[in-house]
Amino acid sequence: MEMRALAQSSTVDFWHLRWEDAVAKGLRIIELASRVEDPISQASARRWVAITLINMGEPNRANPHAAATLVIAKRTRDQYVLATALWFNELLFSYQGDWEAAKVFSEQGLLLSPSDNRMVSSRMLLEYQVGNVAEAREYMERFVEGIQLLPPPPNYDQAAMALKIPLVVQITGDMDLLQIAENAADMVLSASSATPLVSQLARWGLALIAILRGDVKSAREQYSSLILGHTRFVVVSGDRVLGLLSQTMGDSDQAATHFEGALAFCRKAGYRPELAWTCHDYAETLLQRQSPADQAKIMELLEEGISISTDLGMAPLLKNVISLKEREESSLVRGTGYPNGLTEREVEVLRLVAAGRTDREIAEELIIAVRTVTTHVSNILNKTDSANRTEAASYATRQGLA
């Protein structure tokens, strides 16, 4: 009875973000299991200890529990329990960038349960990370179709959609997909049954949507909400999301603080794919700040990002990091020569502003994120002492830049 009660309590702790308690209770169940044969409680304890330690950035401690979960799950002959064990093992290796090991568990899980949205969405992200676009799209379609078939109320699967679709958009640039994620997030947050963890995942999704759209107002709203219950990692680094929100809000110093937190967490945990993305986003933020004091840090981040993404075969990210590095090297060699300290990229944006283009239209033409355009426009207004886009356009005409 004690094992069953602890198992139920540890599950509640996990979904309510009381992770230290979830681990402590799970370990107590494992201790009791040496005296009582109760595979269901053992499997529950092991899996919550495993996934909690994974999210806390302790994969070495999580690994034996994830492996034991799989052994015990096979003994239970419960399809859901086994699929969950396979999924946790897949996550453990994906977060560390061991794609081949992750795929082994993914294939087993999808063979066992082809419509399991957890397995499908994880595989979708994996394939997008390594640039297997055709395969990734197939998993995306399966994921979206699977979510549409779910009955109310919304649960983890809808929250995962709210979070994972924007992560896909960060890789592909397909902004039209964001509406799907936004609808899922709104559905989750309107449900009284949503647990704190599920609600937080939905808010992370809304945060990424605000970042990708360059929506400063929404970015401020999401930052204020997320900073109160700050969680370090679930699929993505919480500090990386907060750093990107800060960048969107125009606070580069605050962004740098969060990015440093994300770097420290990912390095300690060995979560190399997320570390590479953090290097990219941090470097881009410093590039936009345009301080000569940041140049050494920028190159250090870009070199690390290139090294990791090359080693892990993360082709889409590698392309983006190389592009940032070329921009930085070009600006160092050439300098700008433009008035008011405008950079070459800012002049490109200014010309399009003067032509009446919206931020999204500029982003599409220059093949950069909308949030990046928004930051450039803010820098342009400050440097040219312009109150709005119309005054900036007039400045461009006077200076012969348009």
Language-model region placement:
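Extended non-membrane alpha-helical scaffolds
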Residues: M1-V235
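Conserved small-residue packing positions in alpha-helical repeats and bundles
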Residues: S10, A50, E90, M124, ...
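Short coil/turn linking the two alpha-helices of tandem helical-hairpin repeats
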Residues: S10, A50, P151, T172, ...
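Generic long, charged, amphipathic alpha-helical segments
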Residues: A219-D281, E329-P339, E361
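Helix-turn-helix DNA-binding segment
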Residues: T257, E300, E326, L332-S378, ...
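TPR/TPR-like (Sel1-like) alpha-helical repeat modules
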Residues: Q295-A315, E326
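Short, flexible helix-to-coil linker/hinge segments that flank and couple to helix-turn-helix
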Residues: M314-R334
